[in-house]
Amino acid sequence: MRLQRHGWCAAGAILIAATWVVLCAAEAPKGSGELKPTYARTANGELEGVVSDDGKVRIFRGIPYAAPPVGALRWKPPQPAASWTGVRKAVEYGARCMQNRVYDDMVFRDNGPSEDCLYLNVWAPAMARQERLPVMVWIYGGGFVAGSTSEPRQEGENLSKKGVVVVSCNYRLDVFGFFSHPELAKESGRDAAGNYGLMDQVTALQWVRRNIAAFGGDPENVTIFGESAGSFSVSGLVASPLARGLFHRAIGESGAFFGTTLQLKPLAETGKADMEFARSSLGTASIEALRAKPADEILKASAKERMLRFSPNIDGYFLPQDVVTIYAEGRQNPVSLLAGWNADEGGYDAIFGQDPPTAQNFKAYASKLFGGNAEAFLRLYPAATDAEARRSAQDFSGDRFIAFPTWKWLEMQYQKGKSPVYRYRFDQTLPWAADYRPKPGEEPAAPHAAEIEYVFGMLSSRKLPWRSEDRRVSDLMQSYWTNFARTGNPNGQGLPHWPVYSSKDGYRVMHIDAASGALPDQHRARYLFLDSLPTSR
């Protein structure tokens, strides 16, 4: 089954495709052969990139930051990339990592999938050769099962024009990125397995620290930012001792390792399940035999598993403990945080399933799920009418999927961290394509992943009837994001004031849309209720 990631929502660990569709189209890659070459020397050798057609950005694509994780390196932490002599062309995206075709709204411009996929890209202002500009490292989303840096909406050229160096990196996914067989733990020397995709991200950050000065970037001013699984990754990197000192600020767009959406399990549990998968689906539990199998055979077997079957775990190495404990004890990395989510992260179908979306069915659902707490739940998610029940079901699915986990992350960083925290909600209503409109009353305002094109200034990557207000919102978000990367404060001249997240100010939230402004948190009671439930922890 292929899904629209924009239409995804979750109830607990189960993700269900919503009913509406967003039309997407790829922007054709620019003909790099017709553009002026540019050069940079890294620790591994010299690179030849291209200058953008307006002369403002230097672009380097497909830079190897680790050795290809193939053969004996399959399911091992990333190893150093080989150096080269001469000049290496860096004009095309590296292959995306092994993945099944899952999300129809993902459009790629690379020659993957392939196990040989650990490549990154750099966009640097052309005037930055001798400067030390802020660096922003992007981590894509896709449920840890899909994604690539070659998606048109994640092109870093326009964002770089705001005076930052933008980096994006591929990382291993699905069974190739998060397989935690017990034999892997034994051979690791650390009793750790899985989380190879997250260790790839750490290795990319190490590459940035060693090499980004060659592109005009400041290795002492690095911000990581990501969306969905990329935002989950950011919350994990903030918690991980392996990433300490590699970045200085963090931006999370819709997601964190809190709550039940993508619950981290201990290695002992995931290892047992993964060994059984190998034995039953691939016919062997031997790591040597599994490494000898074709990648396509392993990928095909993983496609038969439930969604998010292979995902990060508590391995004792990348994550010494669960993230809640790490944050609660104040042991996370001391970085500033800007995080939030979109107004409509979920869809009511995640709650009703095949049942009619009525008030009666929503109340029955509340009684079944919450028992004695159903009355309290319905005060926060009312269902006096069918229309109100649909809205509450959509709110609850979005809260449990994305809003609550991200809120909990913000709260814990605010309570236990040592640096400022900023919170937002993306409210900008997407324009609809002329040949498609949802049913009346069912149009989401700002669905999951809708902010990506705005953040990157890449509205042109999708065939939608964009309005002048969309372009203004995009410019606003780029300014906020890059200001935060530059100074740790998103505010700047001419921008609506964004207050720091604080109990003294009503936990104010920056609502980002055509009339952006900060308001006190209107839904704090909902998140506190969810936080009080044992299943939310």
Where are these regions (language model features)?
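Bacterial N-terminal signal peptides that target proteins for export
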Residues: M1-A13
